[in-house]
C-alpha cells in the first residue's frame, strides 16, 4: 500500500499546490532535492519517432493507433501525427508532478498518457500552458500565479463530464521511486468531494487528488493490464 501511495503522488497529472504561498516554500526546498534546477532542454527531448511510439503505448492499440500524437519541442508540444478518433496521446515530463515534488526537474521523467476528447479539450490545455511557461524560463511562483489566474478567469476551461485518460504504458518512468508504477486510468472533475466516490477510504482502490485553488479533482483507478495486454505483476 505504501508503494502505491508514493507512486500515486508521483504520477498525478498536473498537480500544483493548494495555495500560492507554498510555492515559495517549495523553491526554498529546491536546494535539498536531487534535481534543484531545470536541466538543459536537450535532456528532456527525445528522438521524434521514439516519442511517438512511447506516446502510443499509453493506451490499447485500438485507441492509440488513430489518436493525435504530440511530441515535445524546444518551445512546447507539437502535433506530430494528426488523429482520427479525438484521442490525444503524448509523453508528459517530470514537471507535471506537484511543484514541490523532489523530482520536478528530473530529466528522466517520461509519462505516456492518452486523453479522451473531453480531457483533450479541457485538461490538456493546462498541460500545454504549464509546459510553455517552463520552457520560456518562468519560475515556479510565476507558473503557479499564471495558471491559477487563468483558471479563475476561465481562460483555462473547467473540466467537461467524462474527461479521462489512459496511463497503461510499461515504458513510462514516473519517478525515481515509482518507476513505471502500475497501469491506471485517471478521471478529471471540476472540484468534487473525493469521498463521495469512496476515494481514499479504507480498502478502496480509488485514489484522489483535490486541488481547491485549481478547482480540480483527479481520481485515479489502477487496472490489471498494460496496454500490450500483459498482466501487471
What is each PLM-predicted segment?
Residues 2-14:
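Bacterial N-terminal signal peptides that target proteins for export
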Residues 30-233:
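Primary mode marks residue(s) on the alpha4-beta5-alpha5 output face of response regulator receiver
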Residues 16-20:
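Hydrophobic alpha-helical membrane-embedded or membrane-associated segments
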